[in-house]
């Protein structure tokens, strides 16, 4: 069975991209004659093959369309709204399979990408067999961590059981069951969806490695390796399996699983299909467009994120339009859109059981009270209520730590209250102790690192990072926990056009961002060569920008494309030592 790959089906050069009009654009690949539709609105692009899902007819402009969103099939006059990729005539029929539209920031070209094969789970199909009560159970542990028991096997998803995520910004909302760590130790295999620290939790894996260093852990073959930081972390795990996308991995005669990529973040995000005796469980985790939007219909169980708020935007921004009322209105609208999107996705896929998870975190540290109060999140109960209104045959599950879903019982009678067992009365549900000092002391240890006695660490670090030839200037200011400038802290400019470090902003026209970073997190990131997710997703900075533009190329580089090996700070200190011996009083000079 060949691995699933992403390939380009149509490429438009920059001039052709600029010529795309708002609304519907019909395009043809002159090399193979295949036809496509590109819909443009508000600078956003959506695309699909020009082929009706009913019987393969070609779409043309719909003369009855008044808003420029609908095309009509020449065969049986079916109509497709390309703004939503939903067929509107007949209603409630199909969703069009969407292509990923990728704009190049280098040359302005556009590529339409398609996964091949698009639905690999259909390979080697298995008929669903009857299940006995207790044969398949799902136990919710906390956040994105579930334990799947299938026959004699136990599989754990994304174990984050202790410690913070994103340096110090995220903490567990739910108290894991008392035996959660024991369950992890006894698992037959572990799936970790991606490298973010609320899924790949090194504090958790440190505990695991002491007793089970050889436990089989499975990850997808992402371009940025999930365990890129393993050696530096000091965690000893010896049985990490990187598997190709879209290929069944057989655990035993009845149990198998398949890892799929995300359409928006294929470099890091993955999702999972597990099948036992022909019964499928779909876990989309954090994927924005899991498997590029093409997913199996009618699975037995579907799980997905739901909460929102997994980003510093807009809470950590200030100046300009970023008033408290603007932030509150934006957050309210974004959460509502996410809620409706998840409900629509469930409606389109029609799983037998749906569970919202992977959103149970809190900004627990007292210094992040503002974030906690501002960063409101969706309610899983509200999402499930919305789903029940449109999916009458879907059982919804709002999990609590230790609650158990028995799949066989649920499938036999979805109204059977015994299908879901909640934790005993009096069980502690929410955490109230996170051992802040233990983990913040680890961050604080970086503040006094030897490299920060030499101001040229800045030049050395950004040369290591390797981002340049981009007309952006940033000012980075080290602060205390409350984002007040730190006495004796570094305050510097970086000009990424030529990767220089001026004392004043250049006179030429340029984009500008001012970034205030908590000193313990920033220095921890610098010393260890970590990604800037700890700063941005962890709410550990405050930002303003002029103009108010998101610089994707810059943030994508510092969040996903930094070198896999940390800066060689020993080499840096050797240079500094040699420079001092030569009589320099500046510390060092790094070319």
Curated annotation (Swiss-Prot):
Ranges in coiled-coil conformation: none
GO BP annotation list: CMP-N-acetylneuraminate metabolic process; N-acetylneuraminate metabolic process
Alphabetized InterPro entries for the sequence: CMP-Neu5Ac_hydroxylase_Rieske, Cnh, RibonucZ/Hydroxyglut_hydro, Rieske_2Fe-2S, Rieske_2Fe-2S_sf
GO CC annotations, alphabetized: cytoplasm
Residues annotated as domain Rieske: 12-110
Residue ranges of the TM segments: none
Pfam families, per the entry: Lactamase_B_3, Rieske
Names of the cofactor(s): [2Fe-2S] cluster
Family annotation (PROSITE patterns): RIESKE
EC number(s) stated in the UniProt entry for this protein: 1.14.18.2
Catalysed reaction equations from the record: CMP-N-acetyl-beta-neuraminate + 2 Fe(II)-[cytochrome b5] + O2 + 2 H(+) = CMP-N-glycoloyl-beta-neuraminate + 2 Fe(III)-[cytochrome b5] + H2O
Functional pathway: Amino-sugar metabolism; N-acetylneuraminate metabolism
Keywords: 2Fe-2S, Cytoplasm, Electron transport, Iron, Iron-sulfur, Metal-binding, Oxidoreductase, Transport
Function statement: Sialic acids are components of carbohydrate chains of glycoconjugates and are involved in cell-cell recognition and cell-pathogen interactions. Catalyzes the conversion of CMP-N-acetylneuraminic acid (CMP-Neu5Ac) into its hydroxylated derivative CMP-N-glycolylneuraminic acid (CMP-Neu5Gc), a sialic acid abundantly expressed at the surface of many cells.
PANTHER family per UniProt: CYTIDINE MONOPHOSPHATE-N-ACETYLNEURAMINIC ACID HYDROXYLASE (PTHR46522), INACTIVE CYTIDINE MONOPHOSPHATE-N-ACETYLNEURAMINIC ACID HYDROXYLASE (PTHR46522:SF1)
Protein name: Cytidine monophosphate-N-acetylneuraminic acid hydroxylase
Organism for this UniProt entry: Danio rerio
Top-level taxonomy: Eukaryota, Metazoa, Chordata, Craniata, Vertebrata
């Amino acid at each position: 069975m060949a691995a699933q790959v992403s390939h380009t089906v149509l490429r438009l050069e920059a001039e052709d991209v600029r010529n795309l009009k708002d609304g519907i654009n019909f395009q043809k690949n002159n090399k193979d004659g295949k036809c496509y539709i590109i819909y443009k609105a508000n600078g956003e692009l959506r695309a699909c093959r020009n082929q009706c899902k009913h019987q393969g007819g070609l779409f043309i402009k719909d003369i009855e369309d008044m808003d420029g969103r609908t095309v009509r099939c020449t065969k049986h006059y079916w109509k497709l709204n390309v703004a939503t990729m939903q067929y509107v005539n007949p209603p409630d029929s199909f969703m069009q399979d969407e292509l990923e539209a990728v704009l190049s920031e280098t040359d302005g070209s556009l590529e339409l990408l398609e996964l091949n094969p698009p639905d690999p789970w259909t390979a080697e199909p298995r008929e669903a067999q009857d299940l006995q009560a207790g044969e398949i159970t799902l136990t919710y542990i906390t956040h994105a961590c579930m334990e799947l028991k299938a026959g004699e096997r136990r599989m754990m998803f994304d174990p984050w059981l202790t410690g913070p995520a994103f340096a110090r910004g995220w903490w567990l909302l739910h108290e894991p069951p008392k035996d959660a760590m024991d369950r992890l130790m006894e698992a037959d295999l572990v799936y970790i969806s991606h490298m973010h620290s609320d899924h790949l939790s090194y504090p958790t894996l440190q505990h695991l490695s002491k007793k089970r260093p050889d436990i089989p852990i499975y990850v997808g073959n992402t371009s940025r390796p999930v365990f890129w930081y393993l050696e530096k972390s000091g965690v000893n795990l010896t049985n990490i399996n990187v598997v190709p996308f879209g290929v069944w991995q057989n655990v035993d005669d009845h149990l198998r699983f398949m890892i799929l990529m995300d359409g928006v973040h294929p470099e890091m995000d993955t999702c999972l299909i597990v099948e036992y005796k022909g019964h499928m469980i779909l876990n989309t985790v954090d994927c924005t467009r899991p498997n590029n939007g093409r997913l199996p219909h009618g699975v037995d169980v579907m799980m997905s994120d739901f909460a929102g708020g997994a980003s510093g935007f807009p809470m950590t921004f200030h100046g300009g339009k970023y008033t408290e009322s603007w932030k509150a209105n934006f957050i309210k609208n974004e959460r509502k859109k996410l809620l409706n999107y998840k409900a629509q996705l469930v409606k389109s896929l029609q799983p037998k059981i749906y569970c919202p998870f992977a959103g149970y975190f809190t900004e627990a540290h007292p210094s992040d009270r503002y974030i906690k109060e501002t960063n409101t999140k969706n309610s899983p109960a509200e999402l499930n209520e919305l789903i029940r209104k449109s999916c009458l045959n879907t059982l919804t599950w709002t999990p609590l730590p230790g609650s158990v879903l028995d799949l066989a019982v649920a499938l036999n009678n979805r109204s059977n209250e015994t299908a879901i067992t909640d934790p005993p009365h009096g069980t502690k549900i929410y955490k109230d102790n996170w051992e802040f000092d233990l983990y913040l002391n680890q961050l604080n240890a970086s503040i006094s690192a030897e490299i920060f006695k030499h101001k040229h660490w800045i030049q050395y670090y950004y040369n290591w990072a390797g981002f340049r030839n981009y007309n952006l200037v940033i000012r980075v200011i080290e602060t205390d926990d409350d984002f007040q400038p730190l006495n004796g802290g570094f305050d510097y400019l970086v000009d990424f056009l030529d990767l220089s470090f001026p004392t004043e902003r250049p006179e030429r026209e340029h984009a500008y961002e001012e970034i205030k970073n908590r000193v313990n997190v920033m220095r921890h990131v610098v010393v260890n060569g970590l990604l800037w997710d700890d700063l941005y997703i962890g709410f550990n900075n405050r930002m303003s920008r002029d103009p108010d533009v998101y610089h994707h190329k810059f943030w994508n580089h510092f969040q996903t494309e930094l070198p896999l090996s940390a800066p060689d700070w020993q080499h840096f200190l050797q240079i500094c030592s040699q420079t001092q011996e030569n009589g320099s009083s500046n510390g060092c000079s790094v070319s």
